[in-house]
Amino acid sequence: MPFGCVTLGDKKNYNQPSEVTDRYDLGQVVKTEEFCEIFRAKDKTTGKLHTCKKFQKRDGRKVRKAAKNEIGILKMVKHPNILQLVDVFVTRKEYFIFLELATGREVFDWILDQGYYSERDTSNVVRQVLEAVAYLHSLKIVHRNLKLENLVYYNRLKNSKIVISDFHLAKLENGLIKEPCGTPEYLAPEVVGRQRYGRPVDCWAIGVIMYILLSGNPPFYEEVEEDDYENHDKNLFRKILAGDYEFDSPYWDDISQAAKDLVTRLMEVEQDQRITAEEAISHEWISGNAASDKNIKDGVCAQIEKNFARAKWKKAVRVTTLMKRLRAPEQSGTAATSDAATPGAAGGAVAAAAGGAAPASGASATVGTGGDAGCAAKSDDMASADRSATPATDGSATPATDGSVTPATDGSITPATDGSVTPATDRSATPATDGRATPATEESTVPAAQSSAAPAAKAAATPEPAVAQPDSTALEGATGQAPPSSKGEEATGCAQESQRVETS
């Protein structure tokens, strides 16, 4: 049955598990991600191989939301540089999403294997990403989690195309978005500054990707003591907010001025002045002959191995501490903020990041209930099973393996496994199959285009001092309106503002 059962509004209309196994052979699990298990599946009729993502409904609302969101977005898109949806089955217990199988390598691996690597190679990669993103933006879709890990080669042929994957955070821009999500090192200033944002955040992320591909260094990374995550976090967000990066020597000595110009325009701090994906495609470094043919492999590969082989920057980023600092001006007891975006919010956040509230003590994973991001400190050897990212079934926040942030079912933002920051479960707008935002039910295909106040988290095992109640604009939905909240919810949110998940 093509696309299985996708009319999830009728709760009684489910696929039987046998429908999946009658059509596909599911092999062993090849990868376990935050929300799902990934299989390599074979179509019994055609013999063609696909990727299958299996989401367990029992793993919680955030898992169900991620599955429904990915289905809704992927059904809207068809582009050669986007991994395409093949089939969908929804049983009473599971979602099965079948996608094209990309057999190529990640971009980093491809670069390391090349005998010759130049700006022109980078230009080819960035052009394909820009074309896919320009297409998404034409549909008013914001990916919100563009990063190198989500870019893969479709196959292992020499001229293989690049494809973008992982759409569980993508969102229709039915108005400016406020909820923070993404991967910390790729976050745009307006996301860090808790301002409303939209499609320009994807262009910023492409600028970060381009910077890394040309130098082997992330733009906002610096050496810190092994466990000094507090200073790393503070400096990371402060630099992002200020746009404080450099084309430092010797890494950029051989890079063309045209390449630097495009990076600068993609990483413009003011989102309304940032170049669009469509405009970037016409830039001389992409469409012209401005990209150099000089071999830069040795320098780039040396920095890639130094910065990324250790995976240090993918590790825990103490987002809760940073977000509390960044929100300090909003919580200082001044007049409550209105629904409109606050001018100068980024500047206030810079000041807060530089000398704001003290961080939570210890290397603990902390979850906030008012929209603050959850954090998890992680040392080099913390890949053990007891820090796994298995979603909790009781609605509680579950710590992850790399300290990044993913959605909880209680309105907080909790640690994830893929380095991404995902919003709380707010029933935000997700596209229906015909492109309309439709009301959500627990089993429906798409969440409704509204924001609601998330229920407070469970009582914390180790309570921390409460902080000021976040303002009503902290987790707005795609409509740009503040989420409604009752006095009871506010009181509960204040009383249970944070919880200690794990102490190292």
From Swiss-Prot:
Q: How does it assemble?
A: Interacts with calmodulin, in the presence of calcium.
Would you name any one GO CC term?
synapse
Residue positions, PTM Phosphothreonine? T438, T462
What cofactor does its activity depend on? Ca(2+)
Q: Domain comment, in the record's words?
A: The protein kinase domain is predicted to be catalytically inactive.
| Protein known as | CaM kinase-like vesicle-associated protein
Q: Taxonomically, what lineage is the organism?
A: Eukaryota, Metazoa, Chordata, Craniata, Vertebrata
Q: Which residues form the Protein kinase domain?
A: 24-286
* Compositionally biased residues, Low complexity: 445-470
Answer yes or no on keyword Thylakoid: no
Q: Report residue spans for region: Disordered.
A: 378-504
